[in-house]
């Protein structure tokens, strides 16, 4: 019987009497090869059976022959994605793994049987079904995967959800592969399995799931290009069995969250207090600490809809657009060190313009897809704009406020001009991270271990970016040369030297040349021309820059791009398509993660099949509604924040103490670096200055500035608190973890202490009515002491230099005398003396002390003190020498509490 017919005999017999849509499931291969084989045995299929079996045995894993260099002179593609290469490696080489003449002596059998030396140990038992499958495949010719064979469509799993009741409960997964010819085969014995949390459920190599402990996770099944997760839920209490309490669900978000909590027996926390809500939403939405006056007013407001009103106010505030523009800068990679000098618009200018371009659109509530379109389709020139007109426009921007003027143009070309974003590979990786929330790095070299992407998928996807260029476009080189000649720029100058000359001319008001982001024309067929001295026509040599004629969106069909002016248009259309599985989900998940400490998919930038959502119905709902509301970002923020789920307390119930992924309570989390610095500055500022900061984003760290109020120490402080480095395609560039260095900074850093004691700050404002003269005297004494310390340091350095040079005699004696004199004027360990003329400080009334204490709590923790806290703080004031000292110490102590640095 011919091998192609023999291999289909079993499948045809099972499906002959049934329509394709109702084809029976082919029994698993371990049953079909359980007994001794006969002459009529089916031929195992290389793609459907042999390669998955090698994966199941561990042969093509990363620790074995699937590593990038193989093992023992034999290599397989990682997890078996390259069927052609795998077949060639099995059949060829100096030591073929298959022996068609004597199949039983094939190395692919002998080594895993350990009949010959094998570093991987024993993987097969003689006579097992696995042994029979491989032996039969070789015996029948070791055929490769047929080019015209049916393609893999999907993997179906049963059960689709597992609900455990006690440890030790078990379930057998059943995996069915569905092929394009209608074949449905039970491939459970050929699958690989993993549990995402062994503390909740384990899964063995046969697909047997066993409950381990309370919680929820997924078990994931891998076969061919299929990756399918199955949720496992193990209730944490008996409430899941029918005694679950009546929990309010005023919004659809709440309904979907509580639906899962009910299965887990988790009761959500109560609503947070008004003070907690105000602090939480102000920090989350605007990156701004509420002022003391704002907290007082909100708590006193009797209107039942005051939370919704406050939300609307915050969405209209400058802080909202500033803070979320900074987040978008994180995701799009606005990195000062990696932006290129584009000629006159240097890196700092480009960085500020990038931020302002995003901020202005977020403030105007431009739909998210339109913001993205301005980035994805970005080029430097406007429609039908000549190169000279482009240079005139950019030069005019420089004469005004460049960032403001630049923000008015429709595109953001700086996204494409970054130094770390120039190759098609870099762009494919960065694009997938920024707009799709997908990590495809693995697929650059091999099959993604936790997703469907292959190396071929990556190569086809990167073709969308091969024609995007940054620099001098081919059609503008002559104009650039002519412009430089008119300007009198030395033609011998290159690079930075030429840029310096151009910048000088720009400052004088001249129109100067600019580099640009552009898209090269699609490739043309090579023209035919006669060869010299011959009568035959020869095609021209291809251009040096080769560009792809086709490209493929992730998980989609191949697209013809050689006739498109800009291949990126296909990507934009695909992302807007309502069937796109990534675009809306990625931004919805990132916004959700900003509010709940974790995403519905966590990490938020890893939307892979093996990393499924903790609540898929919730993510699907939000993504679909976001699309239906025309990608309205303010709608998204308002919808999430208005939910009861967002407004739950951080105080736990008996059932949700350990829950951090199902949104049953607010999870306290450290505030981001920029927010922390602004909060410190606002908390230490006088009331008027704090109000100004709250009403404006100017000079704020959340506004992409360098923390103006912190002077030169701003960058260091931002680094201490984990500001995003924007160096890689990973949300992990921003650190939200607490550290010892942060504690040291808050307690002892010179600039931190200077914020508390600064002139015009809150401490001075509340203490000055009681000790104005004393403050001036103390300030003078401190200034005198610092001058003396500086003189001592100078004298010591001079003396040390003289000794190093070997100077002796009179000069050395004079230096020693100068040092001694300076030391006599230094304060040493004694406190600075206060002028006798200074009037004594007036004692504040008890009501004044209570007011100061209350204000300190409101401006730092956004709540009044408890009775115990107020009593303790008031007592400290009575025990301390001055109001200034007591207020300073109280403010310092509050800034060093966990409650201040945590959003809850």
What are these regions (language model features)?
Residues 1-7:
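Positively charged n-region of N-terminal signal peptides that target proteins for export
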Residues 7-19:
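Bacterial N-terminal signal peptides
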């Amino acid at each position: 019987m011919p091998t192609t017919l023999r291999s289909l005999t079993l499948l045809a017999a099972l499906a002959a009497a049934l329509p394709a849509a109702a084809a029976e499931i082919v029994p698993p291969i371990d049953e079909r090869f359980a007994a001794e084989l006969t002459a009529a045995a089916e031929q195992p299929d290389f793609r459907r059976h042999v390669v998955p079996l090698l994966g199941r045995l561990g042969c093509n894993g990363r620790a074995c022959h699937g590593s990038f260099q193989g093992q023992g002179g034999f290599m397989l593609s990682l997890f078996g994605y390259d069927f052609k290469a795998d077949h060639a490696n099995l059949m060829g080489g100096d030591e073929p793994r298959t022996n068609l003449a004597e199949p039983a002596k094939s190395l692919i059998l002998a080594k895993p049987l350990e009949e010959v030396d094998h570093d991987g140990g024993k993987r097969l038992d003689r006579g097992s079904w696995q042994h029979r499958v491989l032996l039969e495949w070789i015996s029948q010719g070791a055929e490769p995967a047929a080019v015209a064979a049916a393609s893999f469509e999907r993997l179906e799993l049963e059960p689709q959800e597992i609900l455990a009741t006690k440890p030790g409960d078990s379930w057998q997964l059943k995996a069915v592969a569905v092929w394009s010819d209608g074949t449905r085969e039970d491939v459970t014995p050929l699958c690989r399995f993993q549990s995402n949390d062994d503390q909740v459920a384990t899964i063995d190599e046969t697909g047997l799931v066993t409950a381990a402990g309370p919680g929820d996770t997924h078990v994931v099944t891998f076969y061919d290009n299929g990756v399918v997760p199955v949720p496992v839920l193990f209730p944490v209490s008996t409430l899941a069995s029918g005694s679950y309490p009546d929990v309010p669900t005023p919004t659809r978000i709440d309904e979907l969250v509580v639906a899962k909590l009910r299965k887990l027996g988790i009761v959500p926390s109560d609503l947070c207090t008004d003070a907690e809500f105000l602090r939480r939403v102000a920090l989350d939405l605007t990156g701004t600490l509420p002022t003391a006056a704002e907290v007082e007013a909100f708590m006193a407001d009797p209107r039942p809809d005051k939370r919704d009103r406050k939300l609307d106010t915050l969405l209209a505030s400058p802080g909202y657009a500033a803070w979320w523009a900074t987040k978008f800068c994180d995701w799009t990679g606005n990195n000062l060190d990696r932006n290129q000098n584009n000629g006159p618009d240097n890196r700092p200018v480009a960085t500020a313009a990038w931020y302002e371009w995003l901020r202005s659109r977020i403030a105007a509530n431009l739909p998210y897809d339109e913001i993205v379109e301005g980035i994805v389709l970005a080029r430097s020139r406007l429609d039908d704009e000549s190169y000279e007109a482009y240079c005139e426009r950019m030069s005019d921007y420089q004469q005004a406020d460049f960032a403001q003027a630049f923000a008015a143009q429709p595109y953001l070309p700086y996204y494409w001009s970054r130094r770390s974003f120039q190759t098609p590979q870099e762009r494919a990786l960065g694009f997938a991270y920024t707009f799709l929330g997908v990590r495809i790095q693995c697929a650059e070299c091999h099959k993604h271990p936790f997703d469907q992407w292959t190396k071929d998928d990556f190569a086809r996807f990167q073709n969308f970016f091969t024609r995007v260029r940054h620099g001098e476009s081919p059609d503008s080189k002559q104009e650039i040369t002519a412009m430089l000649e008119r300007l009198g720029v030395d033609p011998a100058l290159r690079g930075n030297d030429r840029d310096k000359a151009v910048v000088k001319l720009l400052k004088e008001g001249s129109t100067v040349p600019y580099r640009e982001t552009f898209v090269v024309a699609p490739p043309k067929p090579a023209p035919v021309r006669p060869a010299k001295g011959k009568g035959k026509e020869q095609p021209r040599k291809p251009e040096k820059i080769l560009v792809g004629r086709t490209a493929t969106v992730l998980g989609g069909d191949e697209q013809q791009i050689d006739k498109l002016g800009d291949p990126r248009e296909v990507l934009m259309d695909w992302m807007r398509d309502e069937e796109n599985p990534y675009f809306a989900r990625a931004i919805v998940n990132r916004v959700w993660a900003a509010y709940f400490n974790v995403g519905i998919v966590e990490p938020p930038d890893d939307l892979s099949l093996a990393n499924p959502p903790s609540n898929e119905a919730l993510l699907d709902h939000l993504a679909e509604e976001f699309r239906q509301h025309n990608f309205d970002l303010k709608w998204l923020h308002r919808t999430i924040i208005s939910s009861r789920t967002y407004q739950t307390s951080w105080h736990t119930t008996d059932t949700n103490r350990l829950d951090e992924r199902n949104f049953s309570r607010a999870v306290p989390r450290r505030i981001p670096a920029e927010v922390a610095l602004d909060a410190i500055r606002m908390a230490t500022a006088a009331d008027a200055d704090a109000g100004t900061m709250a009403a404006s984003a100017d000079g704020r760290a959340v506004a992409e500035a360098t923390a103006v109020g912190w002077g030169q120490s701003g960058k260091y402080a931002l680094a201490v608190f984990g500001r995003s480095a924007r160096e890689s395609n990973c949300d992990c560039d921003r650190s939200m973890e607490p550290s010892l260095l942060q504690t040291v900074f808050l307690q002892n850093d010179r600039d931190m202490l200077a914020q508390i004691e600064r002139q015009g700050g809150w401490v001075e404002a509340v203490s000055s009515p009681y000790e104005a003269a004393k403050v001036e005297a103390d300030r003078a004494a401190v200034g005198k002491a610092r001058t003396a310390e500086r003189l001592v340091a100078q004298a010591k350095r001079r003396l040390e230099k003289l000794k190093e040079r070997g100077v002796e005699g009179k000069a050395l004696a004079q230096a020693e005398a100068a040092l001694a004199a300076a030391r006599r004027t230094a304060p040493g360990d004694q406190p600075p003396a206060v002028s006798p003329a200074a009037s004594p400080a007036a004692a504040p009334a008890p009501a004044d002390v209570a007011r100061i204490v209350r204000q300190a709590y409101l401006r730092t923790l956004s709540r009044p003190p408890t009775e115990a806290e107020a009593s303790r703080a008031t007592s400290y004031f009575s025990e301390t020498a001055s109001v200034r000292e007591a207020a300073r110490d109280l403010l310092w102590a509050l800034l060093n509490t966990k409650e201040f640095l945590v959003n809850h």
